[in-house]
Regions:
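Extended, charged helical/alpha-beta scaffold domains that provide interaction surfaces
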Residues: 1-203
Length: 203
């Protein structure tokens, strides 16, 4: 009987050790992920490398769309995904999508997305400057920050931008504030979703 008890106790201790080891590994992975996320948030908050992060995101999304929809042989789905993800009707035709060199096609979509984004940024700046000048003239110098609402048709957010700096930079500061706010929102929402999924996994 005492041998049976010892064997059972040893088995329980081995199981507990395995559980503790897995929890430590889980915590280690979570810490590494947390460091990456906080690094991305720092880039967004302080502007460090934010442009590079956005540029990299364009490339990663372009690569994912091409490889994913090409594998499914779904050109129409690809065209729709370009509209949803990049807000553009791609010039990549069905023949090129299906048979072109994948790296060249990815590069083309990335270039289209980057150029479209740059044009929209320029339009935003051009359209915003008269409004900001009007605010300065009609409201006087006591206005420091302006809240600008933005929406993609599904979600809306308010972007706070400094009035003087936006005027001094010909709207560049507004574009930067928008990029920061969107990037932080996307990172935070994805991180919360990831934490919920990891908690479910931990259970």
């Amino acid at each position: 009987i005492s041998n049976s008890i010892q064997r059972a106790q040893k088995k329980v201790e081995e199981n507990n050790f395995g559980i503790r080891k897995r929890l430590l590994e889980y915590d280690d992975v979570m810490n590494k992920q947390r460091n990456v996320i906080y690094g991305k948030r720092q880039h967004a908050l302080f502007g460090d490398r934010l442009a590079l992060d956005i540029d990299n995101a364009f490339y990663v999304v372009a690569e994912g769309l091409i490889s994913g929809f090409r594998e499914q042989e779904d050109y129409e789905g690809f065209k729709m995904a370009c509209i949803v993800n990049f807000g553009l009707d791609t010039a990549i035709d069905e023949e090129r999508f299906k048979k072109g060199d994948i790296n060249t096609v990815v590069e083309q979509l990335y270039t289209e997305a980057s150029e479209s984004y740059a044009r929209r940024k320029d339009d935003l700046k051009k359209n915003a400057i008269p409004v900001f000048k009007n605010i300065r003239q009609t409201q006087g110098s006591h206005i420091e920050n302006v809240v600008v609402p933005f929406s993609d048709g599904r979600k809306g957010l308010n972007v706070v931008t400094p009035l003087d700096k936006t005027l001094q930079t010909e709207g560049e500061e507004l574009a930067n504030s928008l990029e920061k706010t969107i990037t932080l929102t996307v990172i935070d929402e994805a991180w919360k979703e990831h934490l919920r999924a990891m908690d479910d996994l931990k259970q």
